Amino acid sequence: MSKPISQIEPLPHIAATKPYVPGGKLHGAKGAVAMLASNENPFGPSPKAVEAAKAAAANVHVYPDPDYGPLRAAIAAAKGIADASRVVTSAGSDEIIHLLTQCYAGPGDEVLFTEHAFSMYRVSAGAHGATSVTVPETDMTAGVNAILGAVSPRTKILFLANPNNPTGTMLSVDELKALQDALPPHVLFVVDGAYSEYLGPDYEAQLRDLVDRRDNTVMMRTFSKIYGLAAMRLGWAYMPAGIAAIYQRIRGPFNVSSIAAAAGIACVGDEAFLKMSRDHNTHWRAIMTDALNAMGLPTPPSHANFIVTEFGSDERAAAANQHLKDNDILVRAIGGYGLPTKLRISVGSADDNQRFLDALKAFTASR
């Protein structure tokens, strides 16, 4: 007997939502793979985080603290935040994107983001029935006026990654303030600071202070990048008290594992580890940018832990990507972000960075 056709259908806006496409894997590698596709910290996590996670593993039979008070207090202390109750935690910053969208946007509403923005903004908007509106970019950056010109009475959320992924571009703090001041009060302004630690403590403090200027602004952060806890799935945000209260209503009661919370507490204030990671990134990002430009591959300045380089055509970018794979080097093709002639390359270890440069030099010499 044939199996009956299922009559269970997803909601139309769910069926229409295109899923997030992560960085690829390298199958059939001949040796050690240079992982330069996902913007991970080449040093791994802070040793303090590793030790804390090991200790916490002995108690995984006990539910986590549902309030995450120690984690929120540690984040607030490390980031100069006076009121830890305005810090919220999450299973990666993706969860913050989803929960804020669930709280503030739905069918008939618009969620605004820039043309080459992190694709989870679009996924979350679609998952909650909202309409995605993209702001065109010039030289991989959307200016304040362009963003404001896309705002409508239906706009409920503006997501702005600063620095942006995958382009590495950013608006200045003065531009962020101008944008914040000009936004209508009904628009939630979410600044995604996933890569802000790479700009240093002064910029982090400026983002924090941006939240305190208006009651419609949220700063979102992650432990996946400079802190090296990508597999832990740990994020946080700083927001006005009223928005935090709404967020906490629908956050899962145990959304962060006790192991992730312990690791976060241990590493969020590890300034020596952060400085080492930031200095390494700044040093090698400059070397890689200069080397690629010298090869005739236009590579603009980046403010994150990756660079984006131009190959002139879709075909040449694909050929370069395949050449790197053939040499056990994994980078990120970003055609899905509307940038098919470019590749995004994470700043990795010194050895992996040099392997990448040597392989690409061989490619450009032959093509």
Curated annotation (Swiss-Prot):
UniProt keyword annotations, A-Z: Amino-acid biosynthesis, Aminotransferase, Histidine biosynthesis, Pyridoxal phosphate, Transferase
Record's signal peptide: none
A Pfam family assignment: Aminotran_1_2
Cofactor field: pyridoxal 5'-phosphate
UniProt-listed InterPro entries: Aminotransferase_I/II_large, HisP_aminotrans, HistidinolP_aminotransfase, PyrdxlP-dep_Trfase, PyrdxlP-dep_Trfase_major, PyrdxlP-dep_Trfase_small
Entry EC no(s): 2.6.1.9
GO BP terms in the entry: L-histidine biosynthetic process
The keyword Lipid biosynthesis belongs to this UniProt entry's keyword annotation: no
Domain of life, per lineage: Bacteria
The reaction(s) this protein catalyses: L-histidinol phosphate + 2-oxoglutarate = 3-(imidazol-4-yl)-2-oxopropyl phosphate + L-glutamate
GO molecular function list: histidinol-phosphate transaminase activity; pyridoxal phosphate binding
Disulphide-bonded residues: none
This protein's record includes keyword tRNA processing: no
CDD domains: AAT_like
N6-(pyridoxal phosphate)lysine: residues bearing it: K225
Biological pathway: Amino-acid biosynthesis; L-histidine biosynthesis; L-histidine from 5-phospho-alpha-D-ribose 1-diphosphate: step 7/9
Matches recorded under NCBIfam families: hisC
Database matches in PANTHER family: HISTIDINOL-PHOSPHATE AMINOTRANSFERASE, HISTIDINOL-PHOSPHATE AMINOTRANSFERASE 2
HAMAP family: HisC_aminotrans_2
Protein family: Belongs to the class-II pyridoxal-phosphate-dependent aminotransferase family. Histidinol-phosphate aminotransferase subfamily.
Name of the protein in question: Histidinol-phosphate aminotransferase
Organism lineage string: Bacteria, Pseudomonadati, Pseudomonadota, Alphaproteobacteria, Hyphomonadales
Gene field: hisC
